[in-house]
A protein has these predicted regions:
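Conserved beta-strand-loop surface patch within small alpha/beta domains used
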Residues: 1-84, 91-142
Length: 142
């Protein structure tokens, strides 16, 4: 299983964002360094950019605001970082992708992180979208 490394500060910031937004899902873009596997991902997450969730039912769905998403992508790249992928939260669900998450995934080879607040301690799951399905990544917080 491929590994995604997440800086401790980045993980803490993702969890804080999820808690602030609960009971609605929150979302954003992950920045850092792509891995060196030729496909570019997974890699290391060192930062995130929050993007407003504009879904009609944000308690159970997420949709990144297109203009804010573009601005987040640009901010990460302008800082000299790579766009590693995207994140969203599951305030009451598991840290694995839902059927809706799979149906809406659009960036092949991108990392999709999910912050789950369902358990006593928050969980961070990571997945790589192949273009057809999600492949689970191991997560190491460093």
């Amino acid at each position: 299983m491929a590994e995604l490394v997440v800086d401790t500060d980045a993980r803490d910031a993702l969890v804080a964002h999820a808690r602030e937004g609960a009971p609605e899902e929150v979302c954003g873009v992950l920045g850092g360094r792509e891995g060196g596997d030729g496909g570019g991902r997974p890699g290391r997450v060192t930062r995130h950019e929050r993007v407003p969730n504009v879904a009609e039912t944000p308690e159970t769905r997420y949709e990144l605001d297109p203009e804010a998403q573009f601005a987040a992508l640009r901010a990460i790249e302008d800082a000299g970082d790579d766009v590693v992928g995207f994140y969203h939260s599951h305030p009451a669900g598991p840290d694995d992708p839902s059927a809706t998450d799979e149906a809406q995934a659009t960036w092949p080879d991108a990392v999709y992180c999910i912050v789950s607040l369902a358990a006593t301690e928050p969980r961070l799951g990571a997945w790589r979208w192949t273009g057809e399905t999600f492949e689970e990544l191991s997560v190491r917080v460093d």
